[in-house]
């Protein structure tokens, strides 16, 4: 990738100050040191996000355990360890176990409570492991634990979501099930009368799918384009990394097969048994370290690329929601203008009009014996009320659209900052894994050479 392409993938290049609203955006300086822990000192977080405040919130997800084993209600729980200085926490360090459905509930609550935030998504549940029945295997649970770790890390780096009361309860409460029951009942009771609203929203979405914005905001068009480019690049990198992981797995199998074949030489060549045995053991050790590298590449780094793509989609969904707010404002404005024009026409005494609709209305009024002047005054009165109501609605829609624009600008800046910190952390971990692998392999073969030299000196 050229330097120009890399620059295009950076959302920080989007100019926020040249357009319609006078938005105040947060300054997001570059993160300095490539620390590997997303919350650790050295990530540049302290200077990178002054809006986060002084409170600390660090979460780790590990140690997946299968519970209710042997029953149809078996599930996997994950250990969450939290270090926090928030006053809402009872202790500075807490540990709880949560299952995946608990994370799903938390995610749904956050998306409901913070509609103007790009809430980080959870790993997809529609995976082949559910079909094959091996969703309790260590490979799957490790991948999921890594993804859930990234989910909580993103929340802890978000200036608004990290302060969400439901998140703090999730991270500390010993009676989380009671919280889910109470919140779930409130949400269901509140949504009962609005069941028809689901169809209304669907109808709105369907209609608006064929409606274009009259004045699209160039700022958000640029963000959408850069987000699409990011998804494209991540998709290409993911394919290459997946191929690397497969080749590392194949190489591990070949190394173990090679070690086994050398072991078969020992009965045939007993006079070189120490050398062959040591060589075979060194190959086995190399294969074991290669397995660790492959697991890190496959289970952690490859998963981080997919999770970042999902996070980018969440941002684009927020852009669609912002576009909907602007569309509502434009359509209401158009309706207001139409009603105002119709009212002014009636007030000017040209209520009859020259259209086919006006002609038919006049004929119907004649048949019914309606006084045309009285009917015109009645229509004028209704239009006055409609214009007044629409004026308030348009002003409300404008304020909502402007406020949503402001929030989306902040969300894009937060996404860019979190993305940068996470990518540096993941690349740092991948680099550390390679350094450890090559260091261990070099040590293995250096020891083998030393042993062979000792045996050569002794035999001499």
From Swiss-Prot:
Q: Any idea what a deletion of this gene does?
A: Significantly decreases the radial growth of colonies under nutrient-rich conditions. Strongly reduces conidiation. Causes only mild infection in point-inoculated spikelets of flowering wheat heads and impairs the spreading to nearby spikelets.
> Does the record's keyword annotation contain Transferase?
no
UniProt membrane topology term: Peripheral membrane protein
Task: Please give the Gene Ontology molecular function terms for this protein.
Answer: phosphatidylinositol binding
Q: Where in the cell is it found?
A: Cytoplasm; Membrane; Endosome membrane
Q: Does the keyword Chloroplast apply?
A: no
Q: Which residues form the PX domain?
A: 56-178
Q: Point to the regions of Polar residues compositional bias.
A: 1-16
Q: What is its main location?
A: cytoplasm
Question: GO CC annotation: what is one?
Answer: endosome membrane
Q: Where is this region: Disordered?
A: 1-53
> What positions belong to coiled-coil segments?
238-266, 306-337, 374-403
Please name the GO terms of the biological process aspect recorded for this protein, alphabetically: autophagy of mitochondrion; endocytic recycling; piecemeal microautophagy of the nucleus; protein transport; reticulophagy
**Which InterPro entries does this UniProt record tie to the protein?**
AH/BAR_dom_sf (IPR027267), PX_dom (IPR001683), PX_dom_sf (IPR036871)
Q: Which keywords annotate this record?
A: Autophagy, Coiled coil, Cytoplasm, Endosome, Lipid-binding, Membrane, Protein transport, Transport
> How the protein assembles, per its UniProt entry?
Forms a complex with ATG20 and ATG17.
**Domain note for this entry?**
The PX domain binds phosphatidylinositol 3-phosphate which is necessary for peripheral membrane localization to the perivacuolar punctate structures.
**Main function:** Sorting nexin involved in the separation or division of vacuoles throughout the entire life cycle of the cells. Involved in retrieval of late-Golgi SNAREs from post-Golgi endosomes to the trans-Golgi network, for cytoplasm to vacuole transport (Cvt), and autophagy of large cargos including mitophagy, pexophagy and glycophagy. Autophagy is required for proper vegetative growth, asexual/sexual reproduction, and full virulence. Autophagy is particularly involved in the biosynthesis of deoxynivalenol (DON), an important virulence determinant.
The family annotation for this protein states:
Belongs to the sorting nexin family.
The name under which this protein is listed is: Sorting nexin-4
Species whose genome carries this gene: Gibberella zeae (strain ATCC MYA-4620 / CBS 123657 / FGSC 9075 / NRRL 31084 / PH-1) (Wheat head blight fungus)
């Amino acid at each position: 990738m050229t330097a120009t392409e890399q620059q295009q993938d950076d959302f920080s290049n989007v100019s926020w100050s040249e357009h319609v609203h006078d938005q105040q955006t947060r300054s997001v300086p570059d993160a300095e040191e490539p620390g590997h822990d997303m919350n650790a000192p050295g990530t540049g977080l302290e200077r990178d996000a002054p809006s986060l405040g002084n409170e600390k919130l660090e979460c780790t997800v590990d140690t997946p355990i299968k519970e209710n084993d042997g029953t149809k209600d078996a599930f996997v729980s994950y250990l969450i360890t939290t270090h926090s200085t928030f006053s809402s926490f009872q202790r500075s360090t807490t540990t709880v176990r949560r299952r995946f459905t608990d994370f799903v509930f938390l995610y749904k609550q956050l998306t409901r409570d913070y509609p103007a935030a790009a809430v980080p998504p959870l790993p997809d549940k529609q995976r082949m492991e559910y079909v094959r029945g091996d969703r309790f295997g260590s490979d799957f649970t490790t991948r999921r634990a890594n993804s859930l770790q990234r989910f909580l890390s993103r929340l802890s780096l978000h200036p608004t979501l990290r302060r969400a009361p439901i998140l703090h309860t999730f991270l500390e409460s010993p009676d989380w099930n009671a919280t889910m029951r109470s919140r779930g009942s409130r949400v269901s009771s509140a949504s009962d009368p609005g069941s028809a609203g689901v169809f209304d929203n669907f109808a709105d979405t369907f209609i608006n799918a064929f409606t274009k914005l009259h004045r699209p905001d160039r700022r958000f068009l640029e963000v959408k384009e850069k987000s699409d480019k990011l998804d494209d690049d991540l998709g290409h990198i993911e394919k290459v990394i997946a191929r690397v992981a497969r080749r590392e797995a194949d190489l591990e199998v070949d190394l173990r097969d090679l070690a086994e074949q050398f072991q078969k030489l020992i009965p045939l060549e007993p006079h070189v048994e120490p050398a062959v045995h040591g060589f075979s053991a060194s190959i086995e050790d190399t294969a074991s370290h290669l397995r660790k590298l492959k697991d890190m590449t496959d289970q952690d780094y490859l998963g981080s690329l997919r999770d970042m793509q999902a996070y980018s989609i969440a941002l684009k969904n927020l852009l669609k929601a912002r576009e909907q707010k602007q569309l509502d404002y434009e359509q209401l404005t158009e309706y207001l203008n139409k009603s105002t024009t119709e009212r002014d026409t009636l007030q000017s005494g040209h209520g009859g009009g020259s259209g086919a609709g006006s002609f038919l209305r006049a004929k119907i009024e004649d048949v019914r014996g309606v006084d045309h002047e009285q009917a015109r005054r009645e229509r004028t009165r209704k239009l006055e009320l409609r214009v007044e109501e629409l004026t308030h609605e348009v002003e409300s829609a404008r304020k909502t659209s402007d406020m949503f624009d402001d929030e989306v600008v902040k969300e894009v800046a937060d996404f860019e900052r979190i993305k940068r910190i996470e990518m540096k952390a993941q690349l740092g971990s991948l680099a550390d894994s390679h350094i450890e692998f090559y260091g261990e392999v070099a040590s293995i073969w250096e020891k083998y050479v030393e042993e062979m030299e000792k045996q050569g000196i002794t035999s001499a």
